[in-house]
C-alpha cells in the first residue's frame, strides 16, 4: 500500500506515505514463500506430487518443538499449501538436507543446503533485485548463520526478508507459469512539443523476460493448483481474501518480527505481520 504506521507519542499511530518502502523496505513475509519452498522439494526429489506427510509437532535435539498453527494430521502437498502447513515444509527441508525426521534427532546443515533453496528463490525474484526502473532497490536481507533450525525458519518465510515488490514479482512469476518479468513504471517516451499535447512516441517499453524458473512444468502446475486451493477450497486459509467468482489463486502468510513501537529507537516490541499474494483469474491472470 506504500504506507507506514509510526508511533504518534500518545500510544497510537499515525499513517504516513511510504511509497518508496515498496522497493526499499524488506520484511519477513511468512508462509507466502511456501510455493517456492515446495518447488525446491519437488526439484530435489524430497517429495513427490501427491505425497502425504503427517503434520505433527516436531522436536530436534537442543531445540523447542516446532509446529504448524494447529495439528493438521495426514495431508498431501495440495493440502499443505491450502492449510499452510509448516511441518510439511519442515520434513521436506530435512530430506533436501539428507535427513529423515525422527524425534529429537540432531539436525545440522551447511551453506550448500541454504544455497539450494536460495538459488531457486532467486529465480522467482526473492533475494535479488527485481530490475524495476528506479535508482534504488533493496534485494532483501539474509544471514550466513546456517543452523539447522534456521533452515526450517527459512522454508516458512521466517528468516530471509523480501520487499513487497519482490513478493509481487514472485507471485507474478507463478502466474506466468515460471517466466520472471522485469517490473517497470515507464510505459513510453514521447517527443517534446511546443504545446501541451503529447508528441509522437519515440520509445516504448517492451516486456522484458529476465529468466525462466528451472523446474518441470508439472511441478509448477502443482504449486499453482495448491495456490488455487488456498482461495477456492472450503478449507483454504485464503478463501475470504478474494471473491471466489474471480477464480483467484494465492497464498496467505503470517510472520513474527520486532518493531520500535514507542519511538525510542529500539526495535524491541514483538509484532505480527500478515500478507497475501495472489492473482485472478487463475488460468488467464489480469
Predicted regions and their residues:
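Beta-lactam-recognizing serine transpeptidase/beta-lactamase-like catalytic domain environment
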Residues: 1-31, 36-286
Amino acid at each position: 500500500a506504500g504506507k507506514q504506521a509510526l508511533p504518534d507519542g500518545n500510544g497510537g499511530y499515525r499513517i504516513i506515505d511510504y511509497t518508496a518502502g515498496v522497493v526499499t523496505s524488506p520484511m519477513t513475509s511468512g508462509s507466502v514463500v511456501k510455493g517456492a519452498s515446495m518447488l525446491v522439494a519437488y526439484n530435489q526429489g524430497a517429495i513427490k506430487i501427491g505425497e502425504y506427510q503427517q503434520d505433527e509437532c516436531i522436536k530436534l535435539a537442543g531445540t523447542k518443538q516446532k509446529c504448524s498453527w494447529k495439528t493438521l494430521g495426514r495431508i498431501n502437498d495440495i493440502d499443505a499449501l491450502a492449510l499452510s502447513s509448516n511441518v510439511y515444509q519442515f520434513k521436506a527441508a530435512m530430506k533436501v538436507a539428507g535427513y529423515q525426521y525422527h524425534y529429537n534427532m540432531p539436525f545440522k546443515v551447511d551453506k550448500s543446503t541454504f544455497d539450494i533453496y536460495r538459488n531457486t528463490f532467486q529465480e522467482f525474484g526473492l533475494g535479488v533485485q527485481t530490475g524495476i526502473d528506479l535508482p534504488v532497490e533493496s534485494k532483501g536481507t539474509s544471514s550466513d548463520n546456517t543452523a539447522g533450525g534456521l533452515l526450517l525458519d527459512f522454508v516458512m518465510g521466517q528468516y530471509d526478508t523480501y520487499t513487497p515488490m519482490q513478493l509481487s514479482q514472485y507471485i507474478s512469476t507463478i502466474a506466468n507459469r515460471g517466466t520472471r518479468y522485469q517490473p517497470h513504471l515507464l510505459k513510453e517516451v514521447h517527443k517534446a512539443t511546443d504545446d501541451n499535447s503529447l508528441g509522437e512516441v519515440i520509445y516504448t517499453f517492451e516486456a522484458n523476460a529476465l529468466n525462466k524458473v528451472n523446474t518441470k512444468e508439472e511441478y509448477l502446475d502443482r504449486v499453482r493448483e495448491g495456490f488455487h486451493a488456498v482461495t477456492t477450497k472450503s478449507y483454504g486459509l485464503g478463501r475470504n481474501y478474494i471473491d471466489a467468482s474471480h477464480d483467484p489463486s494465492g497464498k496467505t502468510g503470517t510472520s513474527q518480527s520486532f518493531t520500535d513501537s514507542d519511538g525510542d529507537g529500539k526495535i524491541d516490541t514483538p509484532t505480527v505481520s500478515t500478507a497475501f499474494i495472489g492473482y485472478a483469474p487463475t488460468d488467464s491472470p489480469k
